[in-house]
Structures are given as C-alpha cells and as structure tokens.
Curated annotation (Swiss-Prot):
Keywords: Hydrolase, Ubl conjugation pathway
Gene: OTU12
Active site: 87, 90, 196
Superkingdom, natural source: Eukaryota
Signal sequence extent: none
Enzyme Commission number(s) of this protein: 3.4.19.12
UniProt name for this protein: OVARIAN TUMOR DOMAIN-containing deubiquitinating enzyme 12
MF terms in GO: cysteine-type deubiquitinase activity
SUPFAM superfamilies according to UniProt: Cysteine proteinases
Length: 219
C-alpha cells in the first residue's frame, strides 16, 4: 500500500514538473507572438480587474450585439481568435492554448487553478459569496464555467499577466495582474459577453485552427 501511494505521488509530481517545463519552453518560443498582440493593443488603457463570480448571463439579443462588437474590435486591432469549444471549459481551454499552444490541456490548467484556490484561501475567499470549500470543489468539476476569480487565481498560479479583449460596451480591455509576484509572461484572451473565452493572436501569426466542437455555442 505504501509503495503504491509513493509511486502515485511521484507520478503526480513528475506530471506537474513536466507541465511547467513545457509551459516555460513554449512561453519562450512564443514570446514574440505575445509581443505582437501587445503592440496591437498598446494604445488601450486597461481597466483594473475585480475578481467576482459569474452573476449575469445576457439574453440572446444582448449577446448578439456583444458578439458583433467583439468582432469589430478584433478587426480594428488586426487580431483573431483561436476558437475553443463552448463546453463549459472554455476559459481553461483558452488559457491552456496560451500556455501550451493547445487547448487540450484544459484539465491540467483547471487542476492548477483549483490548487491555487485551495492553497491560498485568504487571497480569494472575500470575493466568494458562498461556502468557500463548496466554491472550489464546484470549480474542480469538468464543465463548470470559470469566472473572474479563477482568472485571478490563474494569473497568480502561472505568474502571468492575463489580458482580456472584451465585448463590453464601456470596457474594451482588462488586465489581470499576479498579486504577489512580477509576471513572467502574458496570456491573451478574448471575452464575449460573460459567456465565452477564446485564445487571442495577431492575425499575421495565428496558428492553424482545428475546428472545435460547437456544443452549447450561440454562434
């Protein structure tokens, strides 16, 4: 029993180390692409981020208008989205694509974010209007929508500044900064109407798009 437990623990530790090594290598390789997106948006004044749970889901008409607004902004700034599946995991898929250049590591990203929530409770608990343990357990489930608290936890866990190009009428650009360390990289996401995230690229450096499943998409 002891050997089995020790083996499982070693395997889990190795997986985590491998994930972080891959992320580091890819962040070095793609730093020029991230810089290209940053130059496109350099004239935008970011709005400070406020961690919060999801509390508003737009109706179809509002979502349609927001989607059109986001498409216009992408066009104006010469950016494009790598679209990820709308299966409830989109925030984690988009973060995975920015970290690993593949949305398929979303389970690992979610797991790291939930670890951050559990291990650093005092940093996030005041933003959660429910039993905190219930909140982070819920966030650990496949298909549970990420929110603005998980974005902050991701920024803290991966030591990355997360930049959102949004569809909001009054807020075009939001920055999420790690709370207690200098960011080592930048992750770029598009954020549509509180319901969907995609991974963001300079249009001239966009990777080949593999068509995702369209489950639960409005568009």
């Amino acid at each position: 029993m002891g050997d089995s437990s020790s083996s499982t623990s070693w395997s889990s530790k190795k997986d985590t180390e491998d994930d972080r090594m891959i992320a580091f290598m890819l962040s070095e390789e793609y730093s020029k692409l991230d810089g290209a997106v940053g130059r496109r948006l350099s004239n935008l004044a970011p709005v400070p981020h406020v961690p919060r749970i999801n509390c508003y889901i737009p109706n179809l008409n509002d979502a349609t208008l927001d989607h059109q607004r986001l498409l216009q902004r992408l066009n104006v700034y010469g950016l494009c989205e790598l679209k990820v599946s709308g299966d409830g995991n989109c925030q984690f898929r988009a973060l995975s694509d920015q970290l690993y250049r593949s949305p398929e590591y979303h389970k690992q990203v979610r797991r790291e974010v939930v670890k951050q929530l559990k291990e650093c409770r005092s940093m996030y608990e005041s933003y959660v209007p429910m039993k905190y343990k219930r909140y982070y357990k819920k966030m650990g489930k496949f298909g549970e929508w990420g929110d603005h608290i998980t974005l902050q936890a991701a920024a803290d866990r991966f030591a990355a500044k997360i930049c959102l190009l949004t569809s909001f009428r009054d807020t075009c650009f939001i920055e999420i900064i790690p709370q207690y360390q200098a960011p080592k990289g930048v992750l770029w996401l598009s954020f549509w109407s509180e319901v969907h995230y995609n991974s963001l690229y300079d249009i001239q450096a966009a990777p080949v798009q593999h068509k995702p499943k369209r489950k639960h998409w409005l568009f």
